[in-house]
Amino acid sequence: MSSTKASGSVKNSAASAPGGPKSQIRRRAAVEKNTKESNSGPAGARAAGAPGSTPTLLKLYTDEASGFKVDPVVVMVLSVGFIASVFLLHIVARILKKFASE
């Protein structure tokens, strides 16, 4: 069944919707949910950005973070040292493999 409008014909039957009628119902519910969420205010103090509601990951990189205080240079030196040790282990493994095969 179709109804005609000034711009052309549009099908009204639910069976013609892509994915069937259940998909159309899900899409409609999702649109209603999105409009309801966008119209409502923050759900709680955490969503409103109240003090003390910062995620833990962001606290790791601030001066107020609890725990170890490590200088960025120390982190870089340890990182490069770890990468170098892995590189050297690969080289040693190749050398040992070469001598073991002879």
UniProtKB/Swiss-Prot annotation:
GO terms for biological process: post-translational protein targeting to membrane, translocation; protein insertion into ER membrane; SRP-dependent cotranslational protein targeting to membrane, translocation. InterPro entries: Sec61-beta/Sbh, SecG/Sec61-beta/Sbh. GO terms for cellular component: endoplasmic reticulum; membrane; Sec61 translocon complex. The chain crosses the membrane at residues 73-93. It is a single-pass membrane protein. It is found in: Endoplasmic reticulum membrane. The keyword Iron does not apply. The keyword Protein transport applies. Keywords: Endoplasmic reticulum, Membrane, Protein transport, Translocation, Transmembrane, Transmembrane helix, Transport. Residues 1-15 have a biased composition (Polar residues). GO terms for molecular function: guanyl-nucleotide exchange factor activity. Residues 1-72 are cytoplasmic. It comes from the Eukaryota. Residues 41-52 have a biased composition (Low complexity). Residues 1-53 are annotated as: Disordered. Belongs to the SEC61-beta family. Heterotrimeric complex composed of SEC61, SBH1 and SSS1. Necessary for protein translocation in the endoplasmic reticulum. This is Protein transport protein sec61 subunit beta.
